[in-house]
Amino acid sequence: MTVKVYEIIDKVYKLIGRPIDNIDTLLQNCDEKVWDIYANALTTTINQSDSDFGKQTLKRYKPTSLGEMSAWVAAIRPGFASLLNTFLDRQSYSTGVEALDDILKDSFHFMIYQESIMKYLVWLGIEEKGTYDIIKKIAKKKFKQEELDALQKQLEEGWVKNVKTIDGFAETWQVVQDAAHYSFNASHSLSVAIDSIYGAYLKSHYPLEYYTVVLTLYAGDMERTSKLISELPYFNIELKPIKFGKSGADYSMDTESNCIYKGISSVKYCNSQIADELLELSKNKYDNFIDLLKDIKENTSLNSRQLMILTGLNFFSDFGNNQYLLNVIDVYDRFASAKIIAKNKMESLGLTDYLMTKYAAKETKSQWREIDNNGLIKELCGRLSNDSMDIVSQVKFDMEYLEYTTYTNDKMADYYWIVIDFVTHKDPCRPTVILRNIHSGEEIKTRIKQPKVFRENPFGCFSILRIDGFTYEFKKKPVNGKWVSTDETEPVLVEYEVYK
C-alpha cells in the first residue's frame, strides 16, 4: 500500500486542480474533520492506517495532533506490544522515576522511539555517540551474551546511582530490548505521520476526488474496494453502477450529483480495452438491444463471458432488465448465424411451423433454408418477458464479479436480510456473518453466540433471514491476559426465521 501513498496524494491534488500543499499549510488546515477520519476509522488507503489492526487502534486512541499521530505510528510496532493498551487508552503512565519521566516527556514517558532509548542509555551513563550502535546491535542480535550481560551490569550501576535502588530497572531494560528490535526513529515516525495526515486531509475535505482516485488505483483489489465503498455513505457519496454510455475504463466523478460512476476495468474479467470500445459504441443510436448486440459481436473484442457479466450487472439497463437481456443474448447466439434449421431440431429450439414459414425463404423435406435471422430473432425476443434476476441470483452475481453488492429492493419489508458473508471457526454452529438489509442496503457484521440457536435454524451464505431485531452486547478485549468488557457494543443474532 505504501508505494502508492505519494501517487494518491499527487493524483488527488491534480484532480482538485491545485499544487500539493506544503507541510505548514497542511497542518494549519487540519481541523476536526481531519481527526474524525481517524476517530471513525475511515482510513482505508491512508498510510499506516489501512489495516484492520490500525483502524481498531485509531478508534481507541483518536489522535488530534501531528505529535500524537507520530507517537501512534511508533507505538503500533510489535516491540511496544506490552504497553500498547495503556498508550491507546491514554492511561496515565510513569516509569516510576520522576527524572526519567522528565527525560521522556516528549514521548509521553514511553520509550517509543529510538531516540527515547538513546536518552535512557545516556541517562544511565552511556556516551551518546555509542547509543545508536547499541540499539542496532540489540536489534540485529549482534551482541554476544557476555557483552549483553556486561552492558546490563553497566546500566544497572547507572540506575542505582540515579535512583538509589535497583527497583524498576528490570522492567525498563526489558522494554528497551523489546523496542530495539522494531522501534522507529522519531524523524521517520514523523514523516510517516505527515504522509498519513495528507491522506486524511484530502479524504475529509475532498472526498469525491479522493475516492475517485483510490477506487481507480485499487480497481483490481476487491477487498480494499469493498472497504472503500463501505466508507462512502459517511460522505453522502453514491456509487453508481457501470452503465452503457456513462462508464469508461476508470472510475469517474459527477460533482453536481456527488456520485462516482464505477469503471469497467474494475469488474472481474473485464479490461480497459472493452471499456473504450463500448464507450465508442455508445456514441451511436440504437433503437433496441439486438442492434447493439450485433455491433458488439462484430466491432468489439468482448467475449461471451464479459458480455454476460456486464449484462448481469445491469450495464445495459437502458434496453431492459438483466434477465431479459441475458435471454435475448441466448436467442441471438442461437440464431444470428443460422443458415439452415433442421426440422427435427425445431421443438428443442422453441420454433414452430408458423415462425419458419414466416422467416424462411425455402423449405425442403427436412430443412428450412435462407433464414431471415434478424426478423426471427426480433420476433422471438418480442415474446420474452422483461424480467430481472431474483434477489438471491442478483446478490450472488454481484458478489462473484464485484465482490460486493449494492442491491436494494424497496418492495421488501425492512426486516428481511440476506447473508453476504458466512465464516465459521472452531464451532461450525457459531458463525460470524455479514447481513445486508434488502430494503435499505444497511450492512451489519454479527455472530451467533449460542450453537443451539443455529442448530435449530441453520442457514448459509445467500440465505434470506427475517430478523425483527438484534441483541447488543459489550465487546471484550484482552488486558493483562484477561478478557474484559469495553464500552463498545456489537450486535448478536439471537432470534431469526430462515425465509429462503
Residue ranges and their predicted role:
Residues 1-500:
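Noncatalytic, beta-rich nucleic-acid-contacting surfaces in large DNA/RNA-processing enzymes
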